[in-house]
Amino acid sequence: MNTSKTSFALIMVLLFLGTIYSQKRLEYRIPSNLAKGVFVASDDVFEIFIKTTDTKNISVRAEVEGETFETIIIDPVVENGLWLIKLSRSLGFEAIDDKLAAHKVVSIVLHIELPKDKEVWVNSSLASVQARGNYEYINMNLSGGDCKLFDFCGSGIINTLRGAIEVETRNTRVEALTRNGIQKVATRPNGKYHLKLKSVDGNISVSQSQ
């Protein structure tokens, strides 16, 4: 896989708040013509909020809280046309002792804004995802988190292990299967869009407007 470090300027803003749990904010932005979408690959993110607007850029804002918040960095690169968002620790960071781990929790929340008709991919064992808007394609692979799509238009695949799947959409053909959960799914057999939803233990709910 070819990886190219983005040569465009990245806008980074660090904001430190003097609270019990200090906070760090990282903001990145690229012109939308440089990538067909975003790929979040991280098991450290707690929540991801995504929306499409009339913007000409793709922007990602990370809010990081916790005692070791200052060691979190984002290394954004473009791979196979997707803006890959990976989180890592800064150079020189040493892993904390297991006995202190419970007191050194770091919470990471991502806010992603991008133009309509882009792709969004998420692979995470922790994150819950909320998305709103029009997309070309989505692909969500989540373990513990939920996936909620509101006022959603687009095709894609959503897989969860324990998390629930909730979709509000229209004109969409839906294939859904949950092994141990409860499903209540509205589908349009001749719909313009196509969603495949699958969960092991999570409930699946799909509603469609006219």
Describe the residue ranges of each PLM region.
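Right-handed parallel beta-helix
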Residues: 121-157
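Acidic (Asp/Glu) and glycine-rich low-complexity loops/linkers
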Residues: 23-121, 150, 155-157, 166-178, ...
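Short, functional N-terminal and low-complexity linear motifs
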Residues: 9, 88-90, 106-107, 123-125, ...
